[in-house]
Amino acid sequence: MATLSEAYTETPLHLQHIIPIDFDSVKEVPESHSWPRSGDESPRRILSLDGDHFSLPAIDLDSPDAIKMVGHACKVMGIFQVTNHGIPSSLLREVESQAWQFFSLPAIAKVRAVRSPGGATGYGVARMTPFFNKFMWHEGFTMMGSPLEHAREVWPHGYGKFCEAMEDYQDKMKALSERLLAMILKYLGISEHDIDWPRLRSNPCSALQLNSYPQCPDPGQVMGLAPHTDTFFLTILHQKDSAHGLQFHREGRGWVPVFPMDGALVVNVGDMLHIMSNAMFPSVVHRVITNEKRHRLSMGYFYGPPMDFRVGPIHRLMQTSGQEVAARFRSITVKDYVQMKAKNLDKALSMIRIR
Ligand code: OGA
Ligand code: NI
């Protein structure tokens, strides 16, 4: 069974594109991390006129209309929040606290968990770093299942609580992802016979990504996470209370901030759901700015199909109301798409688009 790490072996990274700077030791923003002050790439550029007053809809998953609302939000925005999601707040606090413990360590200790050049898991900067001229004000820790291999390098005798919290969180996030995906398919009128549901669920490709955006001497100069779309079906994001920074891009509106809402999780559509829905659901472009003088933490759970699964527009979706709708994408295995994205980032989607 292919793994995500195997998909990355063809695109190994240099250590300079893995190991973050020592954020504790910088007194001013280095040139390497200073983004343009104007232009499309500028972190300062917020086109949204009324963005500050916009709040992303929160859908109560226990509501009788939840399926309709989730489907509608996927179609119109590609991003929404959910409440009554079943993830205990005690678990969210515990994962936050474990993540803080890790990111508060000195740089020399964190680097013991460093991601390998062709690997997918461990400590490091965002994998898309080589595609940009400047570095991001960000450090991350990625895991797929048990983080034991990395955690025990960091805490040889005290990794138990960290691993336990991360594994429990991933189990519950997986169940929530399946619940959301089932709701979305139901909204689309897709039955479990229309797609290979048992196989889709049997060995899903998923990852938990802890993100840390350290305090910055001049937040307006740096980019937390550069604009991107997520690769898999969907992402479920928890933002630690008061520290906001996530923004998504809306046509005609610009960058819209997503303020953390107590008890709510952010869900966004990724490339693979965009492909399977035959472009009905947008794979939402988002970024993170470090606009506050405080350390920000978030936890993203990425949920996708197994590595050898073929993603393509769902056949049944193209035969609605007696009319044949043309497929907008050719189908591709998850592994090939992940590799294509590792080599081409945002160009990957257009490479499989049928014109
Ligand atoms: C990501 C991401 C947003 C955030 O990890 O892909 O978009 O708020 N994170 O940290
Ligand atoms: Ni993302």
PLM features: residue spans?
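Peripheral, non-catalytic segments flanking oxidoreductase cores
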Residues: M1-R355
